[in-house]
């Protein structure tokens, strides 16, 4: 009887030790895997944002996202003719409103006035200006509600589907397109957000 009890006791002890060992192995595996997973997410996030930035710094976006009071024009980013100004609401000065030339559709002639609904610059209260910024500075500006029109990251996704933003992929004759399609751009934006919205240094 004593031998049976001893064997049973030994069996229970062995099982307990094996269970404990297995638990320790799992904990160590999780501890070693977590930093790697976080690092991989950060790397994916940074790669995605670099692609997002390639669109945001193309002439179709950059010409209106300027720190100065007047927009730019063309693929060479030259100052807008007629001394156009941002105005108090981003839609031009009182004397020369944007809609005076920019209608809801592009003009059919080469380099004619482009058009889309709500044609305007970002207003002075939230100029969303990133011309001249590094990729990291652009990233942090885009995430900052005080600089991005008081938008959350999810709001940015919605904003990128507006007719004015979509115009960049239908800019009219004589203007180059952004380096990604609109679908690719939005996909990279979502990927950047879903993987932590990491910013380059």
Residue ranges and their predicted role:
Residues 47, 59, 93-96, 184:
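Short, well-structured alpha-helical interface segments that form or flank functional binding sites
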Residues 44-45, 80-81, 101:
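Short amphipathic alpha-helical surface micro-motifs
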Residues 59-68, 95-105, 189:
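The canonical Cys-X-X-Cys-His
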Residues 57-91:
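N-terminal, post-signal-peptide region of Sec/Tat-exported proteins
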Residues 1-53, 73, 84-89, 108-201:
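N-terminal export/targeting leaders of redox proteins
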């Amino acid at each position: 009887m004593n031998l049976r009890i001893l064997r049973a006791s030994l069996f229970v002890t062995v099982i307990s030790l094996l269970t404990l060992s297995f638990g320790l192995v799992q904990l160590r595996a999780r501890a070693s895997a977590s930093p790697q997973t976080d690092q991989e997410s950060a790397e994916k996030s940074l790669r995605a944002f670099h692609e997002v930035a390639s669109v945001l710094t193309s002439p179709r976006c950059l010409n209106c996202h300027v720190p100065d009071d007047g927009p730019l024009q063309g693929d060479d980013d030259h100052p807008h003719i007629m001394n156009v100004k941002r105005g108090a609401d981003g839609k031009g000065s009182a004397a020369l409103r944007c809609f005076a030339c920019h209608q809801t559709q592009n003009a059919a002639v080469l380099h004619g006035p482009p058009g889309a609904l709500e044609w305007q610059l970002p207003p002075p209260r939230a100029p969303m200006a990133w011309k001249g910024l590094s990729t990291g500075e652009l990233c942090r500006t885009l995430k900052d509600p005080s600089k991005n029109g008081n938008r959350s990251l999810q709001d940015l996704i919605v904003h990128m589907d507006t007719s004015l933003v979509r115009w960049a992929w239908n800019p009219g004759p004589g203007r180059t397109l952004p380096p990604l399609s609109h679908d690719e751009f939005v996909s990279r934006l979502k990927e950047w957000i879903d993987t932590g919205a990491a910013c380059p240094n």
